[in-house]
């Protein structure tokens, strides 16, 4: 887009609101094309997709379990799937086939998912040479555990524990164009800590950034922009700000302010790129009106 910093401040646009109230467990993921798929959460199995072309929501087959806090979706473009964890203190783990629009359950999670739980898939369709068989799972909610799921083996392996317990608002993102060996992990639980997990070394290190002045907790979520090596981060519930972490410099900078606060433990962010246009979509995560979906143009 032919826009410039300062002269063209990012404009927050109101999109079609969700047909159902959002809450703990609302989880979104872009499929790389026309749709953002989303679990409603709110202790329900409702599943939808949002058409970024037509600004319209569509009902889809229900998830195999009720989703709540800790639910999350992860795209697997090489298999044309979305992987999903249940949250809600459950061990449900499944995938949604984007071709047949059907669900299939797989091995149960080795530890219950709840506040701060996350999954990361290292996909060779996103980065050549990545191990396409792996999904990493952190139960968080006071646990420092990390597991690796083998898709071919349908089994979990315990890995090195995080340096400290992960809490509500923890999230992991695979920063594959910055370093394909690393998963960036926001610790959550009200702390300012951010870690890097080395996939090859099965080891953890601190990620230094500035200013490290905000404690991430319930409601935090993050998405990665592989074009710029920025990570977009929403803060804890009750805030209106989206920040942006520059991985190359370690600087945490403001990106935009939303019209209203966002709430609940929702995986609310989706970064969508179609042609030369890129937008950050934000699902508010609140059970009361307006059931907002916003988008912000990303042009610098």
Question: What is each of the regions a protein language model found here?
Answer:
Residues 33-34, 78-80, 131-133, 180-181, ...:
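Short coil/turn segments that connect the beta-strands within blades of beta-propeller domains
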Residues 217-228, 232-240:
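Loop/turn-rich, solvent-exposed surfaces of beta-rich toroidal or solenoidal domains
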Residues 21-29, 66-74, 114-126, 166-175, ...:
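Repeated scaffold domains used in trafficking and secretory/extracellular systems
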